[in-house]
Amino acid sequence: MKKILGIESSCDDTAISIITERRKILSNIIISQNTEHAVFGGVVPEIAARSHLSNLDQALKNVLKKSNTELTEISAIAATSGPGLIGGVIVGSMFARSLSSALKKPFIAINHLEGHALTARLTDNISYPYLLLLASGGHCQFVAVLGLGKYKILGTTIDDAVGETFDKVAKMLNLSFPGGPEIEKRAKLGNPHKYKFPKPIINSGNCNMSFSGLKTAVRTLIMNLKEVNDSVINDIAASFQFTIGAILSSKMQDAIRLYKQILNDYYEDINHPTKLNLKSFRKDEFNWKPLECITRPKYRIHIQNSYRSNLLNDTIVIAGGVAANKYLQEILSDCTRPYGYRLIAPPMHLCTDNAAMIAYAGLERYNNKLFSPLDFCPKAKWSLEDI
């Protein structure tokens, strides 16, 4: 049985996992660095990289022992090779490539975002294509997931990522790190309508998002309040989370319309293997304008007749650390249901950074013989569209 070993080190969690060709997670080890970074109220890249260097050997021993696996049984080694904090990415990638060289097994460089994008295929075995909202500490984007390595970004944040905004607001409120879970916990105790915060570019008519203005509004409110007690913190957390939900819900509706346009307007419904033709949009424009676009061959995918019914897949996936927020899951589920879509979020432990998603992305690439050279250069920035 094929076994893929995955390594994740793009931020502050050192993670190694082993999965089988049948998508069974044999072991999924995560060594957290929260204690090291909590005193700073955020992740310190240098500390993160040094901790990865110290933790990887032990994480490998733990994952092999827990999965009852010998290193010689590993079929391939997959590792996050970007995007992320470059120090940690280099450490994890070098560790993986060393294993690959020593074991004479294939090395597979994985885009961290692709790991998140494919997690629902690991947990729920969904088919391509589907619409994805990737919401994490470093990214927030709507993506049409058309196939392995075939991604179309429909919209993205033009400033701060949503997860980063959660963490920074939590820090303003003197809540512990990481801030996302703390905001969610406090929000349950507060009044979501106590404070009205701005919803930047919510009516722009496209899928792009902005969170910096919201963050500034929260900071201004806190500075102007005479007292910030527990009750006030709860109300701010609830109002902030409510506003995030409203922004994402509005943008989700824009994303659904654009996603349908991509799948319907450019699909040739004929009686033999067909092509889905996607049009690129100009990078310097927020609005997608098909008539001004040129065809990009990398966004053509061939679909067999047996998959025709899946072309209008009724699934929307939310992934990334922010996807673990139950309130946002409920809000987005209510938003997508009238459009005939079901919302899927991976289990909480697979929403946040983990190596099982990296191993699974590696498995899909292994099955398609998409291997990477040992001199693959890790990347701090790496768009899904550039895989």
From Swiss-Prot:
Positions with a binding annotation for substrate: L134, A135, S136, G137, G138, D167, G180, N325
Cofactors that this protein relies on: Fe(2+)
Keywords for the protein's UniProt record, in alphabetical order: Acyltransferase, Cytoplasm, Iron, Metal-binding, Transferase, tRNA processing
UniProt record, GO biological process: tRNA threonylcarbamoyladenosine modification
Source taxon at top rank: Bacteria
Main location: cytoplasm
Pfam family, one: TsaD
NCBIfam families xrefs: gcp_kae1, RPE3, T6A_TsaD_YgjD
UniProt family annotation: Belongs to the KAE1 / TsaD family.
Protein name (record): tRNA N6-adenosine threonylcarbamoyltransferase
Taxonomic classification: Bacteria, Pseudomonadati, Pseudomonadota, Alphaproteobacteria, Rickettsiales
